[in-house]
């Protein structure tokens, strides 16, 4: 019975939002970012884009019903997987979407973003990249895994109010005028637990410099 219900829901939303296909990076606008004049990254901008997430193993960045590689995230049996395994290619986007006017920076990556360590070493460096490139103040909303106290406190350090935060747990599907996204800074492919050896030294140095001064004595 549960399978039949899930199938009917999938068909219903497929009629509303359409089928998702794999897109190409060349169809997405990018901005080159630098950090300390050494490290280079790309910021992807989706015009009238959508994001769908299950808040566990899949995040889909969608433009014109095409899922965008590199910034989309999918995990299959504890492995970081190819875009072809993203659940939206099979199930579509089975949630009603909300619409946000303005620019939204996405900071979600499945379930790991709910963990404080991952928030600190995976997500916060992305905020700093936009800050260092003078783009952070142009963002209207920030799409985050959850809105708990350490998330709110982090954004206070960057002078960003709680009112600008969008929680993924209650907003699994949304569209915006512009969606900004970065690919994961060091997790690429393979077993999830083996990725942390790739943690860049610049991230560790940045975290120490930015947050140690707030340590309670």
Predicted regions: what they are:
Residues 1-217:
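The feature primarily captures lumenal catalytic ectodomains
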